[in-house]
């Protein structure tokens, strides 16, 4: 989820659809207190407020998570940032699922089936 989201948000002109499944979007917790521009510009929760590329508002964004996902709070925060920016997205919260392959195997085909081609 993180890498898909970070790439899509940094390069929205190349991405039409973003499916993030169980993503964490703030890398600061992995940096042991270190912070510089590289950390900032690789933490979507930080840099999204400053972006104004119109393609962000054209992207189809899905944040897939579950109520037992270790990244559940991160997805709620990302949804809030996107909502604050009026960027349309779908926060898909599955019930009673963990941060693991079985739920992602459910999510991915469902998300693919929702893509509208032409």
Task: Go through each PLM region and give its residues.
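Non-catalytic cap/lid and distal C-terminal segments of serine-dependent acyl enzymes
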Residues: 1-118
């Amino acid at each position: 989820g993180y890498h898909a989201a970070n790439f899509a948000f940094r390069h929205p002109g190349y991405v039409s659809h973003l499916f993030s499944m169980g993503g964490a979007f703030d890398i600061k917790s992995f940096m042991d207190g270190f912070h510089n521009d590289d950390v900032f510009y690789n933490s979507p929760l930080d840099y999204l407020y400053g972006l104004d590329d119109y393609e962000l508002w054209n992207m189809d964004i899905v944040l897939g998570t579950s109520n037992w996902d270790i990244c559940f709070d991160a997805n709620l925060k990302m949804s809030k940032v996107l909502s604050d920016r009026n960027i349309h997205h779908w926060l898909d919260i599955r019930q009673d699922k963990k941060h693991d392959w079985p739920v992602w195997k459910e999510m991915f085909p469902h998300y693919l089936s929702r893509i509208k081609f032409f």
